[in-house]
Amino acid sequence: MLKILIPTLMLFPTIWLSPAKWLWTTSIAQSLIIALASLSWLKWSSETGWSSSNLYLATDPLSTPLLVLTCWLLPLMILASQSHLSPEPLNRQRAYISLLVSLQTFLVLAFGATEIIMFYVMFEATLLPTLIIITRWGNQTERLNAGTYFLFYTLAGSLPLLVALLLMQNDNGTLSMFTLQYTQPLHLLTWGDKLWWAACLLAFLVKMPLYGVHLWLPKAHVEAPIAGSMILAAVLLKLGGYGMMRMMVMLDPLTKELAYPFIVLALWGIIMTGSICLRQTDLKSLIAYSSVGHMGLVAGGILIQTPWGFTGAIILMIAHGLASSALFCLANTSYERTHSRTMLLARGMQMILPLMTTWWFVASLANLALPPLPNLMGELMIITSMFNWSYWTLILTGLGTLITASYSLYLFLMTQRGPLPSHIIALEPTHTREHLLIILHLIPIVLLILKPELMWGWCF
């Protein structure tokens, strides 16, 4: 763990001491080396699945894929932000990259923590850099409104979690993840244990987000700069799923009855957010709402607590992280050229930027879960385990899949096909940097087809 954390912390002096000419090159190079070093986590040798580096930090098959995804995303975020930040003064550029690095540090500590309180502290700490990135470097003035939504939704959800964790610490005397799976849920009064169960999961359901507490997500996504959108879609939403999977182990047998309304809400959310996507005119908003739908499927897979559901959830989290991040990067390349997020104003891009259209096509297919891609593997496992739990879920999940395919194709056709608008006369050509950025998103998705057991989590 330290072989990643120490180089990550050493990125701060790199950023603040390197000369202006080499700032972006050195920070991208060093973060890419860290990302490649993080791949060494993917070999497991111990019998328990935990490979512990010290008392406070350890990795297991559930956290490793998410840790690698976090490290992989930092160089991509820095790559994506380069042209967006070039007009800014040098020290602001340095501050921006420093915020991204601090965010990665908190995320690595959150996914690697063995104490739940440490996980909680890091879970909350990720809020701060994200909030500064959205409210300082966002595009429109609504970014302050989006930041307020983001802050209050997240804090209101996670305060009950803190109370629940302190109650548990008081009862058990420990909050270590190694021992908590063997403990009993708290024996409280009639309503006490139900409230305790809800408090344990509410913070994560808001973070995922579950349909109904999702209103902060489209706002935050639309207003955030490109790096903010990427890390939000790819990793911060996955903190919710990861936290739920960690807490689920100790909430039995309460979850058996109490999870019903949440599963129904998650499945209903897939259809509702899909229908919203079909009506969207705003490019980033469409991708943000599609994230809510996918994470609803993940929430359902985790809440029914079967091995297939858990495995499908973690596969879908990883695959969705890469695919939606790629879509946000593509939306950003279009925004940097046309200065508009409205899809009608940026049609017919296939005529001008044909290679970009190829990337749009592949990313849209990854989003709609094309057969060999891991997105489909995750969705199928969750849908199958839900079907085993209740036949009726097939209607909702099947309809959700159909709508997902519809809006993904709608997204592709609206941006790439059709007549060229008259106001698009001279567009700047694409850069190698942008192609590299998208390739580095899509290559892992394609390679994971060949070795999916890297992200099967606990249950293989």
UniProtKB/Swiss-Prot annotation:
Q: Where are the transmembrane segments?
A: 20-42, 61-81, 94-113, 117-139, 148-168, 195-215, 225-245, 258-278, 285-304, 308-330, 351-371, 394-414, 436-456
> How does this chain sit within the bilayer?
Multi-pass membrane protein
| Protein encoded by which gene | MT-ND4
Q: Which GO terms describe its cellular component?
A: mitochondrial membrane
Q: What is this protein called?
A: NADH-ubiquinone oxidoreductase chain 4
The record ties this protein, via NCBIfam families, to: NDH_I_M
Task: Name the UniProt key words of this record, in alphabetical order.
Answer: Electron transport, Membrane, Mitochondrion, NAD, Respiratory chain, Translocase, Transmembrane, Transmembrane helix, Transport, Ubiquinone
Catalytic activity reported: a ubiquinone + NADH + 5 H(+)(in) = a ubiquinol + NAD(+) + 4 H(+)(out)
* Alphabetical list of Pfam families matching this protein: Oxidored_q5_N (PF01059), Proton_antipo_M (PF00361)
The Swiss-Prot or TrEMBL record describes its family as follows: Belongs to the complex I subunit 4 family.
Role noted for this protein: Core subunit of the mitochondrial membrane respiratory chain NADH dehydrogenase (Complex I) that is believed to belong to the minimal assembly required for catalysis. Complex I functions in the transfer of electrons from NADH to the respiratory chain. The immediate electron acceptor for the enzyme is believed to be ubiquinone.
> What are the subcellular locations of this protein?
Mitochondrion membrane
Q: Is Transport given among the entry's keywords? A: yes
- Which biological process terms from the Gene Ontology are attached to this UniProt entry? ATP synthesis coupled electron transport; electron transport coupled proton transport
Q: What is its EC number?
A: 7.1.1.2
